Amino acid sequence: MSDRPLPSSFDPYNSYLLRILLCSVLPVQFLAVHELITRPIPAGCLATSYALLRAYKSMKAGDSAQLNRMFRFRIYAQAFTLLAGVGGGFYYQAERAQRKELERAVADKKAQAKRDAWLRELEIRDQEDREWRERHEAVGKAAKEAGNKPKEANLDAPKVPTKESEEAKPTGGILDAVKSLGKEK
């Protein structure tokens, strides 16, 4: 068996354990029970409506004693509703403030996580941009070095002009190139 003692009706955590049990077993019903416990105003409204319905039925039946009892019950239910609203407002004021604080902290944490993710994405994009620029500069430097290198083959050999190389060498730019095209025909 477990090391914990059996629960007692005098145990201050009894209702807490009951709520935990209800929450784990029946979450939808737990929410209804929790709302009824923390906000008893709907229960007062239902009791008032029930009293009015019973008063109507008593009036139709002609039972004036039951009618008077139901009207008194309606007044008690309305008083309960008012007291529940005022008392619940005072009683749960600290809890509501604590819940708002918790919700604000969760929202701040969520916003901070979103901001951190955005900053990480910006850093990744910046790193990719830097890497691309470095590669682009490396390719540009390699192209410049390849363009500036003289051809190493036959540098020591004497240059002898040939007829083909003299004819193919344009001297006047585009106009000479067009004229040379006309000569080939």
Curated annotation (Swiss-Prot):
Q: Give the range the annotation lists for the signal sequence.
A: none
Provide the membrane topology annotation: Multi-pass membrane protein
Q: Where is the composition biased (Basic and acidic residues)?
A: 128-154
Compartmental location: Mitochondrion membrane
Domain annotation HIG1: ranges: 12-103
Q: Which Gene Ontology cellular component terms are annotated?
A: mitochondrial membrane
The protein's matches in InterPro entries, at most eight in alphabetical order, are given as: Hypoxia_induced_domain, RCF1
Q: Give me any GO biological process, just one.
A: mitochondrial respirasome assembly
Q: Which residues cross the membrane?
A: 16-33, 75-92
Which UniProt keyword terms apply here? Answer: Coiled coil, Membrane, Mitochondrion, Transmembrane, Transmembrane helix
Instruction: Report disulfide bridges, numbered on this chain.
Output: none
Q: How does it assemble?
A: Associates with the respiratory chain complex III/complex IV supercomplex.
Q: What biological function has been recorded for the protein in this entry?
A: Cytochrome c oxidase subunit which plays a role in assembly of respiratory supercomplexes.
Q: Under which name does UniProt file this protein?
A: Respiratory supercomplex factor 1, mitochondrial
Record organism: Uncinocarpus reesii (strain UAMH 1704)
